[in-house]
A protein has these predicted regions:
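Short, hydrophobic/aromatic-rich segments at coil-to-beta transitions
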Residues: 5-12
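Enriched for short, Lys/Arg-rich terminal
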Residues: 14, 18-72
Length: 72
């Protein structure tokens, strides 16, 4: 879990040798959902302050769509 997130299984990919971060989550179907990515170089704290709320909103939209489709 990323500190400050309401999503218990929100994780980040960290490609080796870069400051790029990709936030992802496994949805209730156990499908990996890549929510957003960005380069946090020089923005170590600000990156998460902006990225986590956006990732949470995107994930909620994804879950809403799954509910509308009857998938969950």
């Amino acid at each position: 879990m990323l500190t400050g997130s309401r999503i218990p299984n929100l994780k980040e990919l960290r490609p080796l040798g870069t400051t790029v971060r990709i936030l992802f989550v496994f949805d209730p179907r156990r499908v990996a959902i890549l929510l957003l990515g960005g380069d946090k170089e020089g923005r170590w704290q600000e990156f998460y302050a902006e990225a986590i709320p956006l990732a949470e909103r995107l994930y909620e939209e994804h879950l809403d769509e799954l509910r509308r489709e009857g998938a969950i």
